[in-house]
Amino acid sequence: MGINYSVKADPETTARGMLRDRPISLKHSKAIAREIKGMTIADAESYLDDVIAQRQSVPFRQHNSGVGHRSDIDGWDAGRYPEKASKAFLELIENVASNANEQGFDGNAMAIRHVAAHKVGERQGRKPRAFGSADPWNTTICDVELIIEQPGTDGVDI
């Protein structure tokens, strides 16, 4: 059956990869995806390492109600340090860079052309409450797709 991506990519100039069924926040994933799009693989890896170490915050341009302001963001105010989603994105970026190296490209010099997060469902959970009752306590499940290409080429049809 194969895996479907939301865009068509030229296999001669691009490499791609996907995270499947990860229990990470869709809102955090969208914020990270918006921020790393257009970066090179090396820049994105260092950025995500800084986010995990809480040296650089991710701007929350959507879903930012109640999000505190961060002084390290230029041109925006609301931001957070989404550690769990950043670790998943870092794993995906390393995987796609490895795929690019296997295809004969220089993985660290390639640019992120397309990145998208999709909600695929929820993992059911329960939280015990008073007097023997329980409330739903579900976890969002996300897919993230990433396509990188050589700089100066246009191998992705969006």
From Swiss-Prot:
PROSITE patterns: RIBOSOMAL_L22. One of its GO terms (cellular component) is cytosolic large ribosomal subunit. This is Large ribosomal subunit protein uL22. Gene3D superfamilies: Ribosomal protein L22/L17 (3.90.470.10). The gene is rpl22. Keywords: Ribonucleoprotein, Ribosomal protein, RNA-binding, rRNA-binding. The keyword Ribosomal protein applies. GO terms for biological process: cytoplasmic translation. This protein binds specifically to 23S rRNA. It makes multiple contacts with different domains of the 23S rRNA in the assembled 50S subunit and ribosome. InterPro entries: Ribosomal_uL22, Ribosomal_uL22_CS, Ribosomal_uL22_euk/arc, Ribosomal_uL22_sf. It comes from Haloquadratum walsbyi (strain DSM 16790 / HBSQ001). Part of the 50S ribosomal subunit. Belongs to the universal ribosomal protein uL22 family. Pfam families: Ribosomal_L22. GO terms for molecular function: rRNA binding; structural constituent of ribosome.
